[in-house]
Each structure stands twice: as C-alpha cells, then as structure tokens.
C-alpha cells in the first residue's frame, strides 16, 4: 500500500474529528504515534481499519448528540466537544498517570473488540495508587457532555467527586473544569450586527470583525480590486443551517499573503442563501499594514424576495482584510488554490467547497470544486468548499492535477459492464464567446492511455498560459468520447461524509455548459459511481415548437442533472405534492409562463422535464398514474405541450392517468390525440370535484404549502445523492459477493495470486472516488437534506425520498462494514493457505533430505568389523555428517513449532474446521515422527561408532602393555643366574607393571568393556575386539606371575595390593589370612624404603630417569641362561605369598551379557598409557523415543 496515501487517509480522518487540525495536529499525531507503537506495532493500515475508522464513527456520534442540544447556534470552537481550538478533550491514547490528581479525569477512546472501540473515563482509584478505568455505556453517549452526566458518575464514585477534565495541547496537559467544557461558546456572543446598504437597495447584516481599520462599503462593480469578507446572517431563520455540524467555516493561517477558509460541515449550505461565516481571526491578522495582500470573496444572491419569500438575501458586503501571517507551507490536509501568473488576482487557499456567484454583464464567476493541489484560474476565487450546488455561470476551465498516490493503471470494480467517460474542459480565454472544450480519449483494455502531462499540454490554459503546477487528474480507465460544449455530458458529484477512506482521493469534477447557458458540474466517470449511464447523450436545443423525436426519450429514467436549470426553475411544470380524491399525484402544468417562448424551452426539453416529474412520486402512487392539470386559463396555446405528453405516454403509458384542462378547449386543440382520458374544466370550482381544495397549491387558489424554488433546490441535491448511494450500494454488494465466493482451488501459487487479487480489489473499492466522497461528506449531505426538508414536510414525495436516502445511507454504511468483514475473512483464509503451503514446502524439503542424502549417508557410514584406523576415519566423517543432521533436525523442530503456533492462532480465531488446516495437522504429525526416528537413528549410530572407537583404543593399549610385560619377563629370564635384588631396575619395573595392572586394567573396566560390546546396535559388533582384549589380559596376568617367580622377594606396596584386591571380585566371607596381612605390612615398609631410594637417585633434570627407563626396557648385558632354566620356576621363599599371588592373578569368568543389556558406567584407558577416559562420558544412551 502507498504510505503517502495511508498518511493522507489518517490525517484526513483526524482533521475531521479535531478541527482546526493545524492547531490540534501536534497533540493528536503524538497520541497516534504512541498508539501505533504500543498497540499496532507500527502497522498503519491496521490502525486505520481496526481503530481509527470505528473511533471516528463513535466520536461523530458523540459530537452529533452533544451539538443537537444547541440548535440555532453557531459554535465558536468548531471542534466542540472533541476539542476546544488546540485543546484535545477526547483522547486517542492514555495520558501520563502521574498527571492525575484527585478530582481529575479524562476521556479516551479505546479498542474494545475486533474493529470496535468504546469510550472510557479514567481517573485515580480510591487508594490513589493506580488509574481506574470506567467504560461508558453506549446509551450514555448522548449525555456525556452535560453536567448531569458527571453528577451521575459522582453519585456512583467512591472518593472525591470528579470536577476537572484533563485536556491536552501542545503546551502540555491542563485540567479544565467540566462545567466550562459542557458550556460551549457561540459566535452569537458579539457586538450588534451592522447593516450596510447594498447595490440592490436591500440591507445586509454585517458582523463587526473588530478589525483595526474602519469598515468600507463594498462596491459591486469592483471585481478585481480589494474586496470584502463578512458574515451574512440568515434573517429568516436567524441562524446558519447547521444544527448537527457546528463550526462551519473558520479562518486558518495560510502561506504569506493568503487567507485560508475551511468548512467542517456543509449543513449551512441550503439553497435559501449563500453565507460565509467568518469566525475569530488570529491576532497576527489584525492591525496589518494597508499594503498587505488581501483576499476578495464576492457572493451574489441570485434569488429575489419573491423567489425566496422566507429568506431575505443580500449581496455580501464587507471590508478588506489585511494579512500578515507568517510564511510557510500550509498545514497538512489543506487544499490550496493559486492564481496563475498574470491573472491579476490574489491567491487563496481553502478547505471546503461553497457556491460563489456574482451578477455582471458579459461575465460570471465560475464555481470550481477544490481538489488537492488544484489551481483555479478564474476571475473570482472560490475559497470555500462544501455542498456542491448548481449555479448559473458561464462555462470555464476546470483543470485538476492527478491526486497524490494514484497509480498509473488502476482497475476499478464495477457492478456491471459499463464504461465511464469525462470531458476535460478548458477555458479559451477571457475574450472568447464560448468555452472551447477539448477532450482526450483513452481506451479501456486496449491501447495506451494518455499521460497527465499530455492532457495538460493539449488543453488550453487560462489566458493562454498554463498555470504553475496545473495538471489534470486523468485515470487510465477513462474513455472519453468526443463531446462538444453543446453536448457535454452533465454529471454531478455530491459531497458525502462517512467513515474515513483508505485513500483520500476525490472525484475529478469539471464544468460542462448547460443547454440553457448555465454551468453544471460534471464528474469524471473514472469509477463505478459515475452518474451518467454509458453512451448517454442529449441533443442541444432544437427549434421552439418542434416535434418530439422519440429516440431522444428512449433512454432510462431521466435525471435532474440532465435538465436545464432555467427550465426547472421556470415553473412551467411542477409537482406540488397534492393528491386528488383517488390518491393520484397532482402534476401542474402552466401555459401562462413566459419561459415557453425561450429558445431553451424545446419540445424535447419539456418532454424530459415531464418524464422526470412523473418518476418522482412513490412507487405505489406512480402505479395509479398522475393527474395532469393544465392551467390554461389565460388561453395561451402551447402546441409543444401536447407533443411532450404524447412522448412520455409512448414510453410509459401508465405514467399519466388523466388530463384535466383548466380553461377553454380551444387553447390546446390537440389534446384529443392523447391516449389518456382528457377532461375540460371551465372553472376552479369544477376542479374541486376532482381534487380536494386542501390539496391545491397557491397557484390554484388552494392552501397546500408549496415553494417551487425550495423544491427544485432540494431535489437538485437529493437526486444525485440517491444515485451515488445506489451505485455505491451496487459496488459494495458486488464486492461482497466477490469476496464471499470462497477460496479458489489450487495450490500455493493460486492462493497467492488470489490473495494479491483480493487485496487489489479491496484497495480499488476503497479508493473509488464516489465511495470516498460518500464516506467523507455523505453524513453532512444527509443532515443538510433533512434540514432543508423541514420546510417541505407537507410534500409526501419529499418525505419518501428523504426516508429512502437515509435508508440507503445506512445500507451503504452497513455494506461497507460487511465488505471489510468478508474481505478480512477471505484474506485470513488465503494467508493461511499461503503460510501452510510454505510450511509444507519446507517440511517436504527436510523429509526429502532425510529420505535421500541422509539415509544414504547413514548406510555408508555404518560401523563394520574393520581395523582401528578405518573406524577412526569413519568416525571423523560421521561427525561432519552429524552436523548436517543436527541442522536439519533443528529446522524440522522450528517448522513444527511454527505449525503449532499457526494452529493455535487459527483455533483462537475459530478456523480450526478448515480442511487445509486439518490436512496439514496430519502431515505435520507424520513429519515429526519421521524426524524423531531419523535423529534417533543417527544418534544411535554415532554412539556405536564412538563405542567401537573406544574399544579399539582400549585393546590397543592393552596390547602395548602386553608387549612391555613380555619384555620384562624376557629380561628376568635372561638374568636368572643373578637373583634380582629389591633395589635393582627389574624389580622396580615389575613394581610399576603391577601398579598399572591394578589401576588401568582392573576387573571393573573389563566388565564395563563387556557391557559396551553388548550395548552395540548390531549383534556381534566389537565382539572380536573384546575377545582379543580379554585374551591379552589373561596373558598379561600370566607374564607378571612368571616375572614374580624370578624375584627373590617380590614385595608389593600395601596400597597397590589394596587396589588390586578391590579390582577383583571376592567371594562372600572370603578374606586374607592374618599372617599374610602381617607379611604384607612388612613388605609395604620395604617398598616404601625402595621408593625413597628410587626417588633420591633421580636428578632434577630427569636425565637419570630417562637412562633408568632405557635400562628397564633392555636386557642387562651379560645376562643369559638356558631355555630350561627360563622355563623352570624357582621356589618361593614363603607359601603364603604364593597363595596371595594366586588370588591376585585369578581371572573371574564373566558371564556373557545379553544383547539387550545396557552399560551403566565405568571407565577405561584411552590412547596412551597415562590418560583415562570415563565411559560415563561416552554417548552410550539414545535420545528419548519422542520429542
């Protein structure tokens, strides 16, 4: 999503809640940023959809309820009660709790449920230690900003009563008495109104603006010089029509030399008068020098006292306002309009649209709806915007720039196949007799659309020179047919107000000349809410009295936008609202009006007007047909009237039930050709036989209230509003059906494509210009219509259409929420499918590795009956392979964790019943079982290799010790003639070997070695190594026994004897004889003496020690003997010692261990002769059976 468009949408929503936004923006945006970081993790789109849109609805509801108590008043602070100028009353984020004191509280809008918010009251708890949060029930929203509401809160509150409300501004947090907040200030509190005579002789009330310069009367002819700005007050009603939407227009600082107007409610723009409410000027605007730039706003009241009997209008009078504001860029959300170079007018900027007229011969002002970054090259600037109204003006330029963030190519959803087009109109210059219209055509689905720059270059600019920065808003989907100024498509864009849109884009509006010389707004049909059906054209005015061509009436229901403004207001035909005695609507046609002679009053135009009037009544009334009353009492013949009636009856035979001619039949002789029943009435008394007198309007001398100008203005605003609502409803309904179709079949790619398409569809719908306009200003338009309908309550047609508008508005509002819900559900399911697909792909990758490369490596590196060197090589390779196994295992565990989290999240969202999720759950369980089994197999194989490697090392160590013992025995046998003395080298070597036998090769290590062999996964693996080690151990015992036989006094230290004794199993109750123990005690003392002598003979450098071991490893020189003498065994001096040695070298026969036995511990020697490796440190156990 475009970040700039998202920012624009958020700022637009905040600006509507907290006007003036340039004053409240620092505070409000600070709260928004805190809320984004704390609750939405910086996700602006979720903040907009889940919080800001519901919060905007709630705040508007509270504001409307609060303002409804003060009707007929104009609020000084337009943001009341949500804010007071720059002080924010209703907060979006929590305040610092340390700022709360007893009696203080503040109001905050908080998230409640999914895409729902509620308002809470926060204050200190009774113990003053924490912040107490009190949700405000929805039923109390209409009473919040009243003193009674706080009294009710205090009655239920324990502790000190609440009386101060915390408000936030750029200067900090300030407590304000609640009574001050609930008592709004009004513009009525001002000096008396000054009346200044106007050029028409009427008087106009003028506010005293407290400016430094005296007031100057306005000169009606001075259009280009210094003008005036003032507040015009409605004399008839004594108020501006803005019951529900206060703060109609305010003055805000603009760039240097400009004055910016802005409206936050358009309810005051009823057609009974044109008003500009000028509120308090900032201090910097007062007392400026006369040379400062000025802003001129001219308003002309078109209707006279006779046309508007209930409103006394007057031209705008005022004075020049000097501007001395600081230079700088306008605040966010402000729409600026600038004068092109050489236009001779001062620039102005405005944030609302309002009609501005001025009567002048040969030249009229043009109303230009403001767009973002729109230059308005007109003589008179329109500094305000609001409800768009039809005006009587000359055609003029309407040039717009492409809205920010609009993509070059955008596909719009449409309820049905249609095309939309919009002419781009441009002014040819001040001297041209008529506006020259140039159009650019683009193709929908074929060819290439023209760029906005091309459109700018190809369109004429004001005064022959382009305005700086002037561009058109040109959408690629538009298809613009060739339209002449006389046949320009008449479309009408209406302001709307509702939820904040996703994209703050506006429909492109332009001026098209009407057939009667007036100017009507045209809306580019770039979206599905385009007002005009495709291919619709209306011919220009034909000759008066000409025949009616039926093909001109062959289109669908006529629209009021297609009718000429002068024809509507002429009064030649009207629907006063009365009913005859049968209940048929009364259609009054007057032949006495001078408009029949006008060139724009053609037969086709009259037929179109009558056709439209026949479509206005309610459906049940139209079924009865209309009663047409032709007032021809003055006897004027109108032959075109009969042709018009024939035309509408040819298209809709049941539209006219009966025709009553009030006057002489000779006045309209062709009535007999009409298919409907025709009756001639010569007097009003005869008319009362058909229509009750109370249902007759004033034109037929009846009391029924009817004001034609008000009726026309009401339907000019209502009909386009209804059209836009119907088209928006169709658009939303089609979108909802599209989202409710369900997920398409297919894999991850199809789900990804559908996900992207759904997001684009949702984005396109929410960016639709018509829907955006309804969201922005629909509520305001509806409120304005309700206000204007108060004077037409007697007309049932007005009541029924207003009820339909309210119902359609609520329907669109509900459909918008349904669309968001359906979109969220579909997007959630599609995102789930995509995530599941990615997880399944990753799981398959791990599974394929285990089934392929992993299994092959396990088989290739399996332990076999090989030599020690091969085992060491295989073990090293397997260690590298096991690193890959561990990495795959960790990845598999991470995937399983993600799957579990995804399942838990969907279970919390109620999506556990989805078939994709159920199938993935079974896949994930099978994968986890395979992963565990594979990892356990690798662990077991790694353990087997390590055990086998340790067995080979232990066997090799024992073989080396066996060779040492053989060497010792050989040396002893060679020197048997000379008996070894207790202190010679051979004796010491024997002493060391006996010590090693007792420590390094004891019985427990041999038993542990046997258990390790039994623990291997393959039967018979390592058995040969074990048997060889056992054989070497027995041979070592035999060799050492023979070596002891050559020693005259083989004394062994008592400590070594104890170790050897503990190393072999001793039968229960068996022990050494007492005399033997005493002998070994003496031997221990001799051994210690020998050790002392041995240690004293060693040199510090170790040189003598190395020579001694060299002698021990080689036989003594001169030592020799016969083989027989070697084989002979010398007699031991003591039989007790012989029994002890026999017990020392006796080998316990170990039972064979079963294959299922597992080692429990022990230690054996590793490589070398001095180091030991604990068996408990080796991985002889397997991983758990399950994860």
From Swiss-Prot:
Q: Which residues form a coiled coil?
A: none
Superkingdom is Eukaryota
Chain intervals for the UniProt region annotation (Disordered): 302-405, 419-451, 511-551, 1095-1134, 1148-1187
Q: Where is the composition biased (Polar residues)?
A: 1096-1107
Stretches of Basic residues bias are at: 352-361
State where composition is biased (Low complexity). 321-333, 422-435, 517-534, 1160-1174
Please name the InterPro entries in this protein's record. Answer: Rho_GEF_signaling-related
Which protein, by its recorded name, is this? Answer: Uncharacterized protein KIAA1755 homolog
Q: Which organism is it from?
A: Mus musculus
